[in-house]
């Protein structure tokens, strides 16, 4: 989602990969600036966040940062990996931030390859890594889920449901078998939720792309499904709803055939809307199954049942987060025009 709104065909694309630094530090010799505060709301918070933890600012000057994913250092990455990438949705690009190097443009265009002026939110949004170490993109403008191929182009994984184009795929998560779960709100359409000209689906769905490419509509019951994540055992799917009137997170049991059982609301932040910046958006899950979910007032750290343990408040709207770093214990947060991070005492489960 963005701050503006409540907020297998081979496709030939040309991508420009730059080495320019954008408002990011290339050195690590002095302390980084910090922002916001950490609110500890349960004793368990001290088990996962050090008492002296701070929110470090890594980069600024972005438009609307989103969809971070950690690229591990391994032989599958042509450049060696060891960095975080994330989308700047309005700018239609993906940035890379690496320790000791700072911020650079990783890929552009990232989510829209048509004529200029289509949408204010045309770039890629959510990003993920598949089992082969390839980057999967949720693309607003091109209205598809795609994968970056070793040759540098993209291959479409899915761009329609029963012949009707998706709204604007927003965020995704991938299970152990390679199935991709993704959300499809309308934020990337030219008129956003009010779009009548380009919109082809009457709902905002949550979908599953099977390893063989088949697309299944899992649910259409959520008004604006947004962030999405899996529990460590792969049996529960968490979905955030970025609706100011019902700012909730739901948990769905995953059946043996990949479909969803009845969802239940595990947390409701509707009362915080308007008093704090942001709405339920991207989320991550740690090894203990706790949710680190962006929402009103920052990142809500919750138990699987929704019990709130802490809130990481950057004082800005937060769009998404991911675990990363060499041991997976840094939480990288996309917060409006900033990329920030906080050291935790846990790690992502992947």
Locate predicted features.
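Bacterial N-terminal signal peptides
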Residues: 9-20
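N-terminal secretory signal peptides that target proteins for export/translocation
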Residues: 1-5
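Sequence-structural signature of mature extracellular/luminal beta-sheet repeat domains
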Residues: 24-350
């Amino acid at each position: 989602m963005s701050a503006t709104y409540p907020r297998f065909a081979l496709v030939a694309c040309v991508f420009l990969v730059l080495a320019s630094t954008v408002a990011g530090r290339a050195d690590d010799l002095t302390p980084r600036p910090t922002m916001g505060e950490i609110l500890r709301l349960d004793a368990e918070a001290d088990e996962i966040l050090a008492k002296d933890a701070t929110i470090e600012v890594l980069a600024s000057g972005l438009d609307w940062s989103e969809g971070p994913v950690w690229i591990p250092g391994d032989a599958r990455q042509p450049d060696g990996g060891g960095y975080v990438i994330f989308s700047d949705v309005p700018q239609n690009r993906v940035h890379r931030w690496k320790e000791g190097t700072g911020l650079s443009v990783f890929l552009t265009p990232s989510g829209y390859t048509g004529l200029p002026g289509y949408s204010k939110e045309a770039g890629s949004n959510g990003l993920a890594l598949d089992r082969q170490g390839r980057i999967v993109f949720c693309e607003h403008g091109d209205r598809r889920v795609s994968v970056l191929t070793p040759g540098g182009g993209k291959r479409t994984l899915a761009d329609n449901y029963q012949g009707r184009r998706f709204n604007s795929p927003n965020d995704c998560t991938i299970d152990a078998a390679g199935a991709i779960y993704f959300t499809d709100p309308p934020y990337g359409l030219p008129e956003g939720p009010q779009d009548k000209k380009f919109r082809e689906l009457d709902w905002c769905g949550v979908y599953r792309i099977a390893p063989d490419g088949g697309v299944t509509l899992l649910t259409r019951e959520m008004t604006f499904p947004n962030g999405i994540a899996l529990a460590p055992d792969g049996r529960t799917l968490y979905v955030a709803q970025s609706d100011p009137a019902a700012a909730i997170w739901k948990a769905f049991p995953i059946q043996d055939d990949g479909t969803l059982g009845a969802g239940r609301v595990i947390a409701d932040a509707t009362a915080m809307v308007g008093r704090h910046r942001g709405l339920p958006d991207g989320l991550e899950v740690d090894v203990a199954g706790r949710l680190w979910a962006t929402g009103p007032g920052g990142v809500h750290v919750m138990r699987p049942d929704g019990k709130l343990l802490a809130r990481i408040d950057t004082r800005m709207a937060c769009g998404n987060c991911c675990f990363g770093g060499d041991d997976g214990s840094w939480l990288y947060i996309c917060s409006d025009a900033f990329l920030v991070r906080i050291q935790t005492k846990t790690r992502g489960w992947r």
